[in-house]
């Protein structure tokens, strides 16, 4: 089957909204919305392998640290795992006083009862009700008319009131989503929401949340903005309602739709870090927040250590962040083009502390989000007749990880500037060997002994220190590297680890690469090569540790 010559025979354009006096095009966003993360619910349910409780708790703590104040934690009636996770958050005191847990439920009494039970003992909570309202869902999925769909929402809303009254110690906030709102007739969406509002009887002091999802993107962002503005104008008790957005990215315009929706009068935005979620993902809260930041607006979220946040998200979701993802990708602050490099260099030369940021090609100062300037101006691979990475792979079988390519290119650039000549593959390898493989000071690995028992590792290393001293470090952990890290006298964090074989057969060696952060400093890479993969990984860690300490010493001097 091929694409149709006349797609109008199969697809139709979404109708425009009759709103000739729309005001949102002349509006600007002047403050951050209320943020709600759906990573642990919408994001988690879309993963090939959903997070276990340990990963979910790690993710929760990261969201709290970033500053998200409303977090949709689970679908507690869907599984015992989700129910138990909510109980863990409440019973073990993981919910700060300024943070509200949110949970989702369908419109059935047994599921609603189970959901409220999961929240017993919570100081405050948002309970989120939804049912689909669009024509296709009414006709194809549920075989219900408009009245039937409305009755489902109203009856469930009454059950919310009933079960909340049984737990008066909790400060309840009710949220309703007419799922598939953006594909629903506006008058009907308003009718259903008005009926739910009538049951819940909100006040300006105790508001309800109406969440208006673009469950599937069906039109351009301006149409979604028209829908939001029309809804904000016409919904009853607007002063007692928080209008929330929940955009997906099926057409690639989730960010734009959310921003225009905020201009149209919405108060709140739901999404996921780096855009995880069903199909093409939920709107990316990080991009939304940093878009505000680069317009001079405090986003009320802290991404000062964006690489640390990314590390948690990648490990919990088991999905990589694209190298060209806005703000956080490995390549977004990197210029390969000579003209781009020249403009950036001139921008840095003129940029003064305290002045408005005006460096060409860089919409944000990388330092604001914990990035260094070293990756910004980078050697163009084509100028090296194949590039640094290509030469190392082809001539020596060494495949540098992406972020290490960026770091090492700066080392090569410094050498080419010093020599004023093009470097050969042998010269590049010699520089790699000197910079990484010979990084043996102040600590040189002499030997190590590793013991494995019941899935745990215990390691003892002999280290040659400064002044011909001999040191012995011991540590335990879930693996060899974790055990070694536990035995170090310095606090370090492994940000990334990669390994591969060099060659094949009995003469093969192992190459290991570690990205290490020492005492909260800037991440630094290390390399280890050995016949034994464990030894190679230990050498890589010592390489990174020594390089970091040497750089810190040089900076202090």
Curated annotation (Swiss-Prot):
This is 2-isopropylmalate synthase. The keyword Amino-acid biosynthesis applies. The keyword Transcription does not apply. Its main location: cytoplasm. GO terms for biological process: L-leucine biosynthetic process. Homodimer. Mg(2+) binds at residues 42, 246, 248, 282. It catalyses: 3-methyl-2-oxobutanoate + acetyl-CoA + H2O = (2S)-2-isopropylmalate + CoA + H(+). Its EC number is 2.3.3.13. It comes from Pseudomonas putida (strain W619). GO terms for cellular component: cytoplasm. Keywords: Amino-acid biosynthesis, Branched-chain amino acid biosynthesis, Cytoplasm, Leucine biosynthesis, Magnesium, Metal-binding, Transferase. Residues 33-307 form the Pyruvate carboxyltransferase domain. Pathway: Amino-acid biosynthesis; L-leucine biosynthesis; L-leucine from 3-methyl-2-oxobutanoate: step 1/4. It comes from the Bacteria. It is an enzyme of class 2 (transferase). Gene3D superfamilies: 3.30.160.270, Aldolase class I. GO terms for molecular function: 2-isopropylmalate synthase activity; acetyl-CoA C-acetyltransferase activity; magnesium ion binding. Catalyzes the condensation of the acetyl group of acetyl-CoA with 3-methyl-2-oxobutanoate (2-ketoisovalerate) to form 3-carboxy-3-hydroxy-4-methylpentanoate (2-isopropylmalate).
